């Protein structure tokens, strides 16, 4: 996407690098070497065919935004070696965990971005992704902060641009207000069709779902996760 075509970020929340607890020396070493090997270079033009980004032959490319500690992304990348996966995680501690995992088990079908997800979305060519996962994003529970949620009209427009027709946007959350928010925004957008045949569908985990530590905590605390799937028209 050319600079003049990019949506303005003046009214958007910035999803840039964040740090929590100090990373251990071993994690810091894995982070440095891992990012050298797996990080995408957004200063270069994006290839017209994203499959060329990977060190192995892949048939499709998927994106996961905010992969946390990487449990789901790692599981999917191992499960589907002929699919290329791009993972975004601006939280340094989460990226360090992921880089520790791939140091122990290298993955030729993985690339990562450790900064603002919207910059990556604007870098990608149109109709280049076979799917987007947004799993347990920051819910910004206070109503005055809802405008900071990642699901927004401008970001759904980004999703619509980069997803291939028929590709799926999957969203999981245990926060009812965010689930309703996402349903309303996606149904209002026009480019997405909610894929749910019956009421129970949106409480049924995705096929092959490995679960995450965050999800397990939510269930222990009595919150019921929802799993939404939207198809790009």
From Swiss-Prot:
E.C. number(s) listed in UniProt: 2.1.1.33
Protein purpose: Catalyzes the formation of N(7)-methylguanine at position 46 (m7G46) in tRNA.
Catalytic class of the enzyme: transferase
InterPro entries: SAM-dependent_MTases_sf, tRNA_(Gua-N-7)_MeTrfase_Trmb, tRNA_methyltr_TrmB_bact
Pathway(s) the chain acts in: tRNA modification; N(7)-methylguanine-tRNA biosynthesis
Catalyzed reactions: guanosine(46) in tRNA + S-adenosyl-L-methionine = N(7)-methylguanosine(46) in tRNA + S-adenosyl-L-homocysteine
Upper lineage: Bacteria, Pseudomonadati, Pseudomonadota, Alphaproteobacteria, Hyphomicrobiales
Protein name: tRNA (guanine-N(7)-)-methyltransferase
Keyword RNA-binding: no
Catalytic residues (UniProt): 138
